[in-house]
């Protein structure tokens, strides 16, 4: 299995990209890597070139560039070349920590959509915070690929999320929920009410109804489906709340006197465990589901651990054949039309 890597994408590239790739290479003997980037910057960072191949590129797409224009103009950029390698069958998957919009555009216009998918959805794995939960994470999409969605898009996301949860997370018959402003059936705008009816009518989906943003991290669903605008806003609010709580805790320890500092020392292992559980580096990257091959992006500030874990995630996708199974399902749109519940 070969992964095309954008070695130049990310705030700390190419150093952390190379470090993470080498850690993954040492862990998985069945993986090979093509590193797309500037050889003068990439080669000195490689400790062992076993199963690593540098593919020279002369251009980079920066974080601030307009995505579609960039991939059209910078044909020799690391993002475009890596995505093209996947399209041409020279690699099995594409990984980057670079410009999110450019990665999405390259995935959509170069790698291409699966037949039957109208709009691919950006899919993240989020932690479950509920103590004693049977699972530690869940699938969340669309987290920002599409600001506006139609009923059919969210229906497709439910199936994409189902296949991903089954094959990558190993969840049998995953519970699927719709992100909404209330748990009741009649909540939401016209779009969400219609999507609720559609998902509830499918006998091959384990639809458990609406879920509110406040319940996202409490293990009530294995797959949460939403339009990109709502899902991204809820995700950012959750991240902001977590940061605020950590800031308040640190401030309380710093200004709380000796007793607070002693309490912190006693609870330090607990804080470390919580930090690991909530860290984005633990859960890999965001997948643009609905494409003909794995296209996976990790956050721009990713460290080597995040890179390694994202590559592990890609490997699982390749080994389980989740894309092939998704293609097989969507190859005939009759699958969606014929999956109505018996009334």
UniProtKB/Swiss-Prot annotation:
What is the name attached to this protein's record? Phosphate acyltransferase
Gene Ontology CC: one annotated term: cytoplasm
PANTHER family attached here? FATTY ACID/PHOSPHOLIPID SYNTHESIS PROTEIN PLSX (PTHR30100), PHOSPHATE ACYLTRANSFERASE (PTHR30100:SF1)
Coiled-coil stretches, from where to where?
none
Give the UniProt keywords, A-Z. Answer: Cytoplasm, Lipid biosynthesis, Lipid metabolism, Phospholipid biosynthesis, Phospholipid metabolism, Transferase
Record SUPFAM superfamilies = Isocitrate/Isopropylmalate dehydrogenase-like (SSF53659)
**E.C. number, please?**
2.3.1.274
Molecular function GO terms recorded = phosphate:acyl-[acyl carrier protein] acyltransferase activity
Reaction(s) this enzyme catalyzes, per UniProt: a fatty acyl-[ACP] + phosphate = an acyl phosphate + holo-[ACP]
Q: What class of enzyme is it?
A: transferase
The cross-references to Pfam families, in alphabetical order and at most eight, read:
FA_synthesis
From the broadest rank down, the organism's phylogenetic lineage runs: Bacteria, Bacillati, Bacillota, Bacilli, Lactobacillales
Pathway assignment reads: Lipid metabolism; phospholipid metabolism
Give the species.
Limosilactobacillus reuteri (strain DSM 20016)
Function comment: Catalyzes the reversible formation of acyl-phosphate (acyl-PO(4)) from acyl-[acyl-carrier-protein] (acyl-ACP). This enzyme utilizes acyl-ACP as fatty acyl donor, but not acyl-CoA.
Give the protein family.
Belongs to the PlsX family.
Where does the record say this protein resides?
Cytoplasm
The alphabetized list of GO BP terms reads:
fatty acid biosynthetic process; phospholipid biosynthetic process
- Which domain of life does the UniProt lineage start with? Bacteria
Identify the main location: cytoplasm
Q: How does it assemble?
A: Homodimer. Probably interacts with PlsY.
């Amino acid at each position: 299995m070969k992964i095309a890597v954008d070695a130049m994408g990310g705030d700390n590239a190419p150093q952390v990209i190379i470090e993470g790739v080498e850690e993954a290479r040492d862990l998985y003997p069945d993986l090979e890597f093509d590193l797309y980037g500037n050889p003068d910057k990439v080669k000195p960072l490689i400790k062992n070139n076993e199963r690593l191949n540098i593919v020279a590129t002369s251009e980079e797409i920066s974080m601030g560039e307009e995505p579609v224009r960039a991939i059209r103009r910078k044909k020799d950029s690391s993002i475009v070349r890596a995505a093209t390698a996947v399209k041409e069958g020279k690699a099995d998957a594409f990984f980057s920590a670079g410009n999110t919009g450019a990665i999405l555009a390259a995935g959509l216009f170069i790698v291409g959509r699966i037949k039957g998918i109208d709009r691919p959805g950006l899919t993240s794995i989020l932690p479950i915070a509920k103590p004693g939960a049977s699972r530690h994470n869940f699938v969340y999409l669309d987290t920002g690929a599409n600001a506006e969605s139609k009923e059919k898009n969210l229906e497709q996301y439910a199936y994409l999320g189902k296949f991903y949860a089954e094959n990558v997370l190993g969840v049998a018959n995953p519970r699927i929920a719709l992100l909404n402003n209330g748990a009741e059936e009649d909540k939401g705008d016209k779009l969400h009410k219609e999507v609720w009816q559609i998902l509830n009518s499918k006998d091959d989906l384990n639809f458990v109804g609406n879920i509110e943003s406040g319940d996202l991290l409490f293990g009530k669903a294995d797959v949460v489906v939403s339009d990109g605008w709502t899902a991204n806003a809820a995700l950012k609010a959750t991240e902001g709340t977590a940061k605020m709580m950590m800031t308040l805790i640190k401030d309380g320890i710093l200004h709380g006197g000796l007793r607070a500092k002693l309490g912190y020392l006693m609870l330090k292992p607990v804080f470390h465990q919580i930090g690991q559980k909530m860290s984005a580096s633990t859960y890999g990257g965001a997948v643009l589901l609905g494409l003909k091959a794995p296209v996976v992006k990790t956050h721009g500030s990713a460290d080597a651990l995040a890179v390694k874990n994202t590559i592990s995630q890609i490997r699982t996708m390749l080994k389980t054949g989740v894309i092939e199974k998704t293609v097989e399902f969507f190859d005939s749109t009759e699958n969606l039309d014929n999956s109505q519940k018996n009334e």
